[in-house]
C-alpha cells in the first residue's frame, strides 16, 4: 500500500492541464493502485492523477458505500463524448479542497470514452453520482476545480481561506 500526499488548494499544480497517457505498463498499473490507496485512505470516491502531483490524464473512481464490496474503476485518457441537456445538482467536495462542499449543477448523463489500465478502449454511459463524479474528475485533468462552477464571490472566499491556511502551514514549517 502506498498512499501519496494530496495536492491542496491553492497549489498551482491543480490548475495544470494533464497530458495524455502514452504507455500502458506495470508502472501505470502500480500508480493506479497507489491512487486507489490514497483515495480510500482520504477517504474519497474519486481522484485524478494531478491531485497527487502527476499531470497525466488518469483518474480512479469507486462509488461503493461503506460495507459494500469495492467497485474500483480506472479511466485513462477519458473524454466526455456526449452529455445531456437535462441537468442535475449534487453537493460536491474535493480531496484537494478539504472540508468544503457546494452544490454544483452539471449535465445529468454523460457518455465517456476512455482506456482501461491495459490500454483497451472502453466506453461508459453514466448518470447520477457516477456522471457527476466523472465530470468532476475530468475537470481536474483540464485544470478546472469544482469551485469554478460556483459564484465568483463564494469561489474567491474559498481561495482566500485556503491561501491563508497554506500561509499558516508554510510559517509552521519555517519554525
Swiss-Prot record:
Single biological process term from Gene Ontology: co-translational protein modification
Catalytic activity: N-terminal N-formyl-L-methionyl-[peptide] + H2O = N-terminal L-methionyl-[peptide] + formate
The keyword Iron belongs to this UniProt entry's keyword annotation: yes
Keyword set includes Protein biosynthesis: yes
Keywords on record: Hydrolase, Iron, Metal-binding, Protein biosynthesis
Binding residue positions for Fe cation: 94, 136, 140
Cofactor (UniProt): Fe(2+)
MF terms (GO), sorted A to Z: metal ion binding; peptide deformylase activity
Residues of the active site: 137
Cofactor binding comment, as recorded: Binds 1 Fe(2+) ion.
Leader sequence segment: none
Enzyme class, UniProt record, top EC level: hydrolase
EC identifiers of the protein: 3.5.1.88
Short name of any one Pfam family annotated for the protein: Pep_deformylase
Family (UniProt): Belongs to the polypeptide deformylase family.
Role noted for this protein: Removes the formyl group from the N-terminal Met of newly synthesized proteins. Requires at least a dipeptide for an efficient rate of reaction. N-terminal L-methionine is a prerequisite for activity but the enzyme has broad specificity at other positions.
PANTHER family: PEPTIDE DEFORMYLASE (PTHR10458:SF22)
HAMAP family: Pep_deformylase
Protein name according to UniProt: Peptide deformylase
Organismal lineage: Bacteria, Pseudomonadati, Pseudomonadota, Alphaproteobacteria, Hyphomicrobiales
Gene: def
Amino acid at each position: 500500500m502506498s498512499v501519496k500526499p494530496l495536492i491542496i488548494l491553492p497549489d498551482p499544480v491543480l490548475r495544470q492541464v494533464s497530458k495524455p497517457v502514452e504507455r500502458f505498463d506495470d508502472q501505470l498499473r502500480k500508480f493506479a493502485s497507489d491512487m486507489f490507496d490514497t483515495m480510500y485512505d482520504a477517504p474519497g470516491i474519486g481522484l485524478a492523477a494531478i491531485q497527487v502531483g502527476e499531470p497525466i490524464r488518469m483518474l480512479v473512481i469507486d462509488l461503493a458505500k461503506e460495507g459494500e464490496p469495492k467497485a474500483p474503476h480506472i479511466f485513462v485518457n477519458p473524454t466526455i463524448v456526449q452529455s445531456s441537456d437535462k441537468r442535475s445538482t449534487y453537493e460536491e467536495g474535493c480531496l484537494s479542497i478539504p472540508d468544503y462542499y457546494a452544490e454544483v449543477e452539471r449535465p445529468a448523463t454523460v457518455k465517456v470514452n476512455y482506456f482501461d489500465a491495459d490500454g483497451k478502449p472502453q466506453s461508459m454511459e453514466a448518470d447520477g453520482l457516477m456522471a457527476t463524479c466523472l465530470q468532476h474528475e475530468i475537470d481536474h485533468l483540464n485544470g478546472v476545480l469544482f469551485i469554478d462552477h460556483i459564484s465568483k464571490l463564494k469561489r474567491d472566499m474559498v481561495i482566500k481561506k485556503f491561501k491563508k491556511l497554506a500561509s499558516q502551514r508554510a510559517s509552521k514549517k519555517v519554525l
